[in-house]
UniProtKB/Swiss-Prot annotation:
One of its GO terms (molecular function) is structural constituent of cytoskeleton. It comes from Neurospora crassa (strain ATCC 24698 / 74-OR23-1A / CBS 708.71 / DSM 1257 / FGSC 987). InterPro entries: Beta-tubulin_BS, Beta_tubulin, Tub_FtsZ_C, Tubulin, Tubulin/FtsZ-like_C, Tubulin/FtsZ_2-layer-sand-dom, Tubulin/FtsZ_GTPase_sf, Tubulin_C. The keyword Metal-binding applies. Mg(2+) binds at E69. Its main location: cytoplasm. This is Tubulin beta chain. Pfam families: Tubulin, Tubulin_C. Changing F167Y: Causes resistance to the fungicide benomyl. PROSITE patterns: TUBULIN (PS00227), TUBULIN_B_AUTOREG (PS00228). The gene is tub-2.
Amino acid sequence: MREIVHLQTGQCGNQIGAAFWQTISGEHGLDASGVYNGTSELQLERMNVYFNEASGNKYVPRAVLVDLEPGTMDAVRAGPFGQLFRPDNFVFGQSGAGNNWAKGHYTEGAELVDQVLDVVRREAEGCDCLQGFQITHSLGGGTGAGMGTLLISKIREEFPDRMMATFSVVPSPKVSDTVVEPYNATLSVHQLVENSDETFCIDNEALYDICMRTLKLSNPSYGDLNHLVSAVMSGVTVSLRFPGQLNSDLRKLAVNMVPFPRLHFFMVGFAPLTSRGAHHFRAVSVPELTQQMFDPKNMMAASDFRNGRYLTCSAIFRGKVSMKEVEDQMRNVQNKNSSYFVEWIPNNVQTALCSIPPRGLKMSSTFVGNSTAIQELFKRIGEQFTAMFRRKAFLHWYTGEGMDEMEFTEAESNMNDLVSEYQQYQDAGVDEEEEEYEEEAPLEGEE
């Protein structure tokens, strides 16, 4: 029933993916080997969205793990939940892509892609009613970015009417892993604009900030960052995995969130976020969750939505929450901060409810927003891209793999178009009262 096939590519994608499976296995009452020992019927009811049932009460993730070098996969296999995955679903090369998008997309990755598609096909054929695909990857590297986007376009060709959701880790403004990130990211965005239905943008720097500022961790590890990402992924997919009063699936989310097909890049947030010692001192209530989830400091992508306006957004509440209270809070947010929502889409906040909270919490909320402020992120990458491309720096690594400079120029202009489309809709319909938007006031209820 409404299955999702999950792919994780590259080092970043595999690490986030592993954290995600760890989180949802826990929520569904599965232990590290996939055996069910939960307590609630509700955990089993929609288990098959993400898991295949094997013999002996064992559940196996419908996940395909892809990388161009064996290292990360070995780490996943040796990790706490390594025995969960089906061994045939590990597909890896030996050479690595070396942070080179062209290697992932055209040479090394292209050699491996048919093997991956065979596994994807096998998983898809086992589904009653395939809903779509989700892929975790980063946009700054070689495998996740290059091969990830190659897989997306191949899957798109073969399953044109299924949803394609991506959880994409975008390069951060200050924390850079490799010098060619702007190239890889721009080439990837060029692909995602055309081939993905919904892209959840996550960036490491915003995650670092959340870890340090809100969770009070002095030096956060990648494990801590991945934990945050998996909380969001779990929240976005919760209404697919558990029955709730107001359910949404990938397609409903897309219908509500994407006003124009190209503008499908979302900012995500999660609440409650409290430091490890402090959660005993806070009562979690719907108003509190709402305030925290609309707080720009809690966004997991480094762009401040106060510099733009929301086209649409979606709030997913979990736990024992009252429907009326949620509706009131949502109306409240829209009325008090109406300048942050475009006025030509009335009621542009969608809510979903699910009665099962995440482990260890009474209630939580996940936020997905389609804000025009995401253009900051693309602008920033575009500027870095242009700075290097103007000098043709590092280009030989890409042309050596058979790429053409023309492709870079196309990707650059596609990204610039995307930025100006966001800008155009941000300005739309406010011609008369242009002056009011000069000074940006902070959101109500936060200093």
